[in-house]
């Protein structure tokens, strides 16, 4: 399977991290890496489709009630407030609803425009 993970941090300076991780046969890794890169480039060139973004937003929003009863969620939000002095919960729903394909496209363009790409391929010991 494939998974992706992204973070945005302000400390010690503004930075973004986007990871795409997958398990595969080492011989297939170059092809999958190129597919991941071309997928990101497509987002930078075209943005996500309205349908894709709508489904993603729906998924983010449906998790809000469950998150609000989780101690782990609130522990994370308190940590963010302590570290950054910002409330990342109150306007979360509004921010998600205001996401547009154009905003996502601009964000991805900004990340890819940095040309800061590191590729790791781990292979089993022979």
PLM regions: where:
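M16 family metallopeptidases and their MPP-like homologs
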Residues: 1-45, 50-98, 116-125
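Low-complexity, intrinsically disordered Gly/Pro/Thr-rich segments
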Residues: 101-110
């Amino acid at each position: 399977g494939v998974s992706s993970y992204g973070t945005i941090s302000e400390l010690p300076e503004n930075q973004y991290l986007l990871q795409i991780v997958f398990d595969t046969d080492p011989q297939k890794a170059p092809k999958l890496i190129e597919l991941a890169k071309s997928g990101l480039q497509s987002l930078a060139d075209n943005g996500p489709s309205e349908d894709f973004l709508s489904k993603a937003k729906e998924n983010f929003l449906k998790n809000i009630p469950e998150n609000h009863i989780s101690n782990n969620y609130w522990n994370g939000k308190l940590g963010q407030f302590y570290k950054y002095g910002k409330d990342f919960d109150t306007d979360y729903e509004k921010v998600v609803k205001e996401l547009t394909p154009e905003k996502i496209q601009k964000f991805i363009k900004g990340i890819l425009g940095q040309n800061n790409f590191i590729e790791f391929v781990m292979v089993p010991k022979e």
